[in-house]
Swiss-Prot record:
Molecular function terms from GO: calcium ion binding; enzyme regulator activity
UniProt superkingdom: Eukaryota
Binding of Ca(2+), residues: 140, 142, 144, 146, 151
Lineage: Eukaryota, Metazoa, Chordata, Craniata, Vertebrata
Source species of the chain: Rattus norvegicus (Rat)
Family annotation (SMART domains): EFh (SM00054)
InterPro entries: Centrin_CML-like (IPR050145), EF-hand-dom_pair (IPR011992), EF_Hand_1_Ca_BS (IPR018247), EF_hand_dom (IPR002048)
Cross-referenced PROSITE patterns: EF_HAND_1 (PS00018), EF_HAND_2 (PS50222)
Entry-linked SUPFAM superfamilies: EF-hand (SSF47473)
All copies of domain EF-hand, residue ranges: 18-53, 91-126, 127-162
Protein's name according to its UniProt entry: EF-hand calcium-binding domain-containing protein 11
A UniProt-annotated Pfam family: EF-hand_7
């Protein structure tokens, strides 16, 4: 068993009608000339409006490289796909943060082996202590006896079954 098998998975699926309307409204607001697509700058503004941060050059390049070469921009359909993926990633990260916080009962910002033992005894009481120790050691990337949120997030995203 590894952390990524513990149940935290992106929740792919349907977006609500109100959320879709909001995204379409943002698209239209950023498509000032009614071109039917968002330029690189339009896209950046739309992401700021929806997520509160300016996308990096790498992120913008990745989106623009998948854009229609005839329009040199991102269509509504493409924009909705990008926004939905970003929203799912955001929800997944929040879920990981929630799990980490549930493990971190002392609010220290890191987890110890004792935190792992306590959490696993509640959710998987028959799991051998040796397995809990192995999971902890694998999550503790720098072997300092503490699993930071970054360590935990990495383990949740990249863990492998043994």
């Amino acid at each position: 068993m590894f952390l990524s098998e513990a149940g935290a998975r992106p929740r792919a699926g349907e977006i609500s009608a109100s959320e879709r309307r909001k995204w379409v409204e943002v698209f239209k607001a950023c498509d000032e000339d009614n071109k039917g697509y968002l330029s690189r700058e339009d896209f950046k503004v739309a992401i700021v409006m929806l997520f509160g941060y300016k996308p990096s050059k790498i992120e913008a390049d990745a989106v623009m490289s998948s854009a229609n070469p005839d329009t040199s921009g991102v269509s509504l359909e493409g924009f909705l796909n990008v926004v939905q993926r970003k929203k799912e990633a955001q929800l997944y990260r929040n879920e990981i943060r929630h799990i980490f916080t549930a493990f971190d009962v002392h609010y220290r910002g890191f987890l110890t082996l004792e935190d792992f033992k306590r959490a696993f005894s509640q959710v998987a009481p028959k799991l051998p202590s040796r397995t809990v120790l192995e999971v902890f050691r694998e999550a503790d990337q720098d072997s300092d006896g503490h699993v930071s949120f970054r360590d935990f997030e990495y383990a949740m995203n990249h863990g492998k079954a043994k």
